[in-house]
Amino acid sequence: MYTLRRTGVKGCIINYDKTSLIEGFDCINDFDKCNCLITNIECCPTDREISEIMDVEYCWIEGKELMRLLKKEDFQWIWGVFSVFPKNVTLDEVLKYDYPYADGYTGFWKSPISVQHPLAVSEIVAWDGMYILLIAENDESVNTFMKKNIFAKDLEEYNRELI
């Protein structure tokens, strides 16, 4: 099976109106060569193709195809967890675990930060239409996103301020 690599997980949070999901995915190395499981889907596309793809319990999609859809229409996401997997991880393997979720998940607000799905390397989360969270095993992805977005805040620091 897989060895879980959970050391060095880092996260950041940013107001939804200060960035886009595309910017988050652009910071994940080789995202176009990954697969993505989208769960807890609540979004408002007007494009028929996108609406039909997202009107499901979960969506398994190649990173390159997801980027094409997000560039086709910049629509609002209320809830959604985008779990990113290397190409060698299959949908059958992914579905052996519970679906990641955003609405009601308290793990975002606790330290240490972790990726929900044990086989995923990164997660981007649309949270309540207000925030986007980027959580990754690769600090570089989060650091790059934070450098590009001055409004992004380290998620562990954000959580400490809530206490």
Where is each model-derived feature located?
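N-terminal leader/presequence regions that precede the main folded/catalytic core
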Residues: R5-G8
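N-terminal interaction modules that seed assembly of large macromolecular complexes
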Residues: C12-L70
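Phenylalanine-focused residue identity feature
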Residues: F25, F31, F75, F82-F85, ...
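Short, flexible beta-strand-to-coil junctions
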Residues: D32, T39-P45, F85-K87, A126-D128, ...
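Surface-exposed, low-hydrophobicity interaction/linker segments
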Residues: R48-V125
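Acidic, proline/glycine-rich low-complexity IDRs
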Residues: I113-I163
